[in-house]
Amino acid sequence: MADPSAFYEPEEDELLSQLAIPIQNYQPLSEGDEYRRLQQLEQHAYAQQTAMAQEQEMEQLAVLELIPEDVKRFLVMFHQAILENDLPTITSMYESGWNKLTQAHYLNNEWPEAELIAPLVGNDQVFLTLYRELYFRHVYARLQPTIDDRFQSYENICELFNYLLNSEGPVPLDLPIQWLWDMLDEFVYQFTSFSHWRSSPKAKTEEELEMLAESPNIWSSYSVLNVLYSLVQKSQINEQLKAERAGKSVEEVTEVAGEYGSKPLYKNLGYFSLICLLHVHVLLGDPTLALQTMENVDLGNAAFLTRITACHVTTYYHVGCAYMALGRWPDAIKTFVSVLIFFIRMKQYHTRSYQYGSIAKTCERMYALLAICTTLSPGPSDENIMTIVKEHYGDQLAILQRGGPEALEAFKDLYLQACPKYLNVNPPPYEDASALEAWLANPPADATQRHLELFLSDVQAVQGVNGMRNLLKLYTSIDAAKLAAFSVSGEEEGEEEVLQQLMVLKSASSTYGRGQAETTLLDGERKVTNNLDFTIDGTMVHVEETTSHRRYAGFFIRNAEHAQRALTSIKSAPLPVRKPASSSAPAPATTAAPISKSGESAAPAPAEAPAAPEKKAGTWVPKSRQARIAA
């Protein structure tokens, strides 16, 4: 039988009786004593808070002492310039001062954290947010970012954009266009970097897997596109560009822009957001939508984007890649050639720019893509650009034009070297363990490999009929049976097979291309992509060459300018100075004048001219020096 005392619970009075202080001896405090007790507690808590604040301040001062004095002066002056919206000073400090201090003190380590420099700038949160944007950009460029850096950079840039977009009115901030472009370009770069890093779960630690599972929306495609489209909508940039293209006055354009779009900060952010949308849509594999976002952006030589070389090169590179994805090879060639000519002319002004390295790499990738496009769509192009292409990729270009299995490998290598690093839209399901295991067991194909397969399928369709094109160049008209007998494959082919190859060649040799009157990037008309066209009448093939004549005017102008510069250089160069005779040489002996019969001395006979020094064998004299001596 169970013991009933096992479930006995003592009464409350019995428990209180066991306390050390009897309940009847307790005397409640008076109101005055209670007030004094609360006051003492408040004073004690305040003293503790003060001590902690002083301790933190001492720690901050100790850390601030480790920061170089020139860095502290720079941060104070930078903060003051931003408060005063002093645009020239901000531009100088951003483009020059920041990079010089980075080279001097923080080439291989981080800048001080924002919390450490907060006392120097009066804890200004707007400036600290801008400083963090530069801080994380430096981490991505010089160091290896950790997962905390990736998360914090996303939170900081979202905080900055929320401040710009969700304020009650336009924020009183003025930043240089170079900084605004770099900010948005870095935003897209960090998004692509995080997407590639997130797409490989096998290389993640347990802590990283947990953080990715808890934050599936960090650096998501939706959040990035939402920010860019919000900036476009807030600035009314498309409406402004349409009004400017329609020839409306400045007042009318300002009225269309509205309260936010009329401010340079929002207008420039909206304009650069269109270019970043082009970039993102190309990476996500939607070239049509990428070109649609640029329908109101002018790509001429006087366009706003040409003010920033990095923006100019990036825009044309992704427009050309979008055209390649659509199979519009002539438009891609025109786009690449246009920006490469600009880069060659402006190269001397950007060799010392901190962005010159990345710009040069992008141009090098465009040379490789140009080698691909000119092979798939042969035709006249700029000679200077094609000379550089042959210098850089001469061996690959010969293989591409020769055709065969080697050409397919060369196409593959050049494409992987120069194409954008495409992104997978759907990241691994880190938040679902079972789904992640299934994903690891059967991972999806890489986005770049999918685009490579599509590209190679187009190449194979064209390369399979290259021999047929070479045969057609020899005739103006030829029968299909005779063409089958001359087949380069070495196999006997009937008329039907030859006609099928001709139809494939006809289809592969035509595409859409922009004309002179086209306004948007997607508009175009049907064009022949090479210098050969033909028609089929029954079994007879009529061939017509469409090679355009070379324009000699530009050739003569360039060479005349080069000759004029050479002549000016020769005329401005100093003439050679003949060395004086050495003082140690003996003086020439003087002979006495002969005495005439009349007693007067006769005039001395004229001295013979010294013989010209013999020219040593093998001595080379520059032509420019010969010209100066002759002059």
Curated annotation (Swiss-Prot):
Residues 571-631 are annotated as: Disordered. It is found in: Cytoplasm. The keyword Methyltransferase does not apply. It holds the Pfam family Paf67. GO terms for molecular function: translation initiation factor activity. Keywords: Cytoplasm, Initiation factor, Protein biosynthesis. Residues 580-612 have a biased composition (Low complexity). Residues 335-526 form the PCI domain. Component of the eukaryotic translation initiation factor 3 (eIF-3) complex. Belongs to the eIF-3 subunit L family. This is Eukaryotic translation initiation factor 3 subunit L. It comes from Cryptococcus neoformans var. neoformans serotype D (strain B-3501A).
